[in-house]
């Protein structure tokens, strides 16, 4: 009876530990985390997030991005699932929300809500177009996101490994929004 109760206690402890880890990462769902690349598993990448590992699947990787073990990378947590083996954390480097969260971390005006990211169109690894709007007429939304000498946007570009980012002014008028998106080309 003693070995059975010992195993039962150990099993309950492991279950509680898995629940704590699940809860911790469930709170970070739809947010960014920094992970350390562990190894390649086929075409997928195993990433250590601290208390748990995540798998960056091939379809959530940016084409052409190559990581080596010990590289620190920022990831967007798409979903956290509870499984009998512990939490399964689905992460992405291609999700448009990754760009939004990186700007929230880099630009105080975006974080505090003065500047709002209204829309993001992303071709991961190549180009992102982001439409921004300010609820304070004294704050230039594009300028706030670009930063002095491009410092803020360059920090995000660096994290995205050179992906081009176009920041445009948002407009409720679809024709004006399209004109802004196509700039510097002229819409006739």
Give the ranges of each region predicted by the language model.
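RNA-contacting regions in translation and RNA-metabolism proteins
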Residues: 1-188
């Amino acid at each position: 009876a003693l070995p059975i109760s010992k195993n039962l206690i150990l099993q309950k402890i492991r279950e509680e530990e898995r629940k704590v880890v699940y809860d911790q990462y469930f709170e970070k769902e739809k947010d960014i985390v920094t992970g350390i690349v562990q190894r390649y598993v086929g075409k997928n990448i195993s990433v250590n997030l601290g208390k748990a590992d995540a798998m960056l699947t091939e379809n959530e990787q940016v084409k052409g991005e190559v990581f080596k073990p010990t590289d620190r990378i920022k990831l967007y947590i798409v979903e956290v699932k509870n499984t009998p083996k512990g939490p399964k954390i689905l992460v992405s480097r291609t999700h448009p929300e990754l760009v939004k969260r990186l700007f929230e971390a880099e630009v105080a005006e975006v974080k505090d809500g003065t500047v709002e990211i209204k829309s993001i169109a992303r071709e991961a690894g190549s180009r992102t177009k982001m439409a921004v709007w300010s609820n304070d007429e004294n704050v230039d939304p594009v300028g706030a996101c670009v930063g002095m000498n491009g410092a803020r946007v360059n920090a995000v570009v660096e994290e995205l490994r050179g992906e081009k980012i176009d920041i445009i002014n948002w407009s409720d008028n679809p024709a004006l929004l399209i004109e802004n998106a196509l700039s510097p080309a002229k819409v006739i």
